[in-house]
Amino acid sequence: MTARLTIRGVRLIDGIADEARANVDVTVEDGRIAAIGAASEVPPPDGTTIIDGAGQTLLPGLIDCHSHYPIDTTVDDGFESFRHDPDTLIALRAAGAARRALESGVTTSRSAGSPGAFDYVLRDAITAGFVQGPRILAAGPAMTITGGHGWPFGREADSVVDFVRGVRANVRDGAEVIKAVASEAAMLSGWDQGAGGAEMTEDELRAVVDEAARLHRRVLAHAQGGEAVRRAARAGVASVEHAFLASEADLEVLKASGATLVPTLSVTDVWRTIEGLTPVSRSRQDYIEPLHRRSCETAIRMGIPIATGTDCGVRGVTSDMVAREVRLIHEHGAPAMTAIRGATSIAARTLGLEEEIGTVETGKRADLLLVDGDPLSDLRRLERVRVVVKGGAVVHRVAAA
């Protein structure tokens, strides 16, 4: 039997137009968007499930371009949890984070690296319907230099040949994207005020990008300091993650490359007020946060494409914070509609999935989010989720109060 769904009378933010459209019906059939228009133009077929969208806004499902679902968010360095937590607990934690993300409106998530097979197992379990969560683009272990950021749970390499071999191994194991660690992690590693230093060489980064492209994969690069941002951008990565300490000159190189910036603003935003940080962590936060703000504001002013990525797995940063990330992008200078596109059409283009998701258009995969009110007047309304549709199926619904 053909599965049909019509969401009636909504305000539509389609991820393309500069303005929302009022009083629109969107019909879904067999997992795809079949029709969009006024009610008189789109009569629903017999047997259609109807959702009344009056007073609500329909958007494309949200996209998280930087997630770590298996990591413990309750400790300063969640990577340490992999040293002592049993695999069963890690897997259950990942499943819980995935469900939390889905219920907040996230329908696609790009992993930014996890140890072993956790990414692949979670992705496959969601695809099989064993657990609920967003569609996951799995990265597997991040590519890093020996002793570099994330080394205990990454794939270490020390030459162009080693990095090429690592990309091939990750793809063999099931990776759909490749994570390259181009710099230190200023918030986590031992550091001074020169934190965020470059780790992978530009030749190594270029080798990763070239081999990934040969295998039809894209590369995201953890790059916090300016030199790492420049190296990653020149190497041809699809996106630069964080850029906490990047200057305008560094960002000029990023802009020229055409790569997207995924600033992960929730990290320093959450840490501004979180309790229980160690004195060292508080010192890192106090130093990095204003520089991070300046970097993102500069990137927005320069017109660099910005996409949402929570970096969930960092202490206090949870998988339901994509809507928060949209709001933070707006607060750093982007118009509200542009910030929403950062979680929809810009994010989809960053992942290379713009033909499938990221906009509400006929023929696209029916990943949809219905929220109360008008988020363009208050982006906090993105957190007032009413219905989440993934692949044409209603996967989460909140009854009206």
Regions found by a protein language model. Name each.
Residues 2-5, 12-59, 80-81:
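Histidine-rich, glycine-flanked metal-binding segment
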Residues 56-130, 149, 203, 235:
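Metal-associated gating/positioning segment near the N- to mid-region
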Residues 68-90, 99, 132, 140, ...:
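Active-site gating loops and adjacent loop-to-helix segments of metal-dependent hydrolytic enzymes
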Residues 73-76, 119, 188-190, 229-235, ...:
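Histidine/acidic-residue-rich catalytic or RNA/ligand-binding cores of hydrolases
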Residues 93-119, 132-144, 175-189, 218, ...:
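Divalent metal-dependent hydrolysis catalytic cores, especially in the metallo-beta-lactamase
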Residues 155-235, 239:
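Metal-dependent enolase-superfamily TIM-barrel catalytic cores that perform enediolate-based chemistry
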Residues 214, 289-371:
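His/Asp/Glu-enriched, well-ordered alpha-helical/loop segment
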Residues 343, 349, 362-401:
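C-terminal cap of metal-dependent C-N hydrolases
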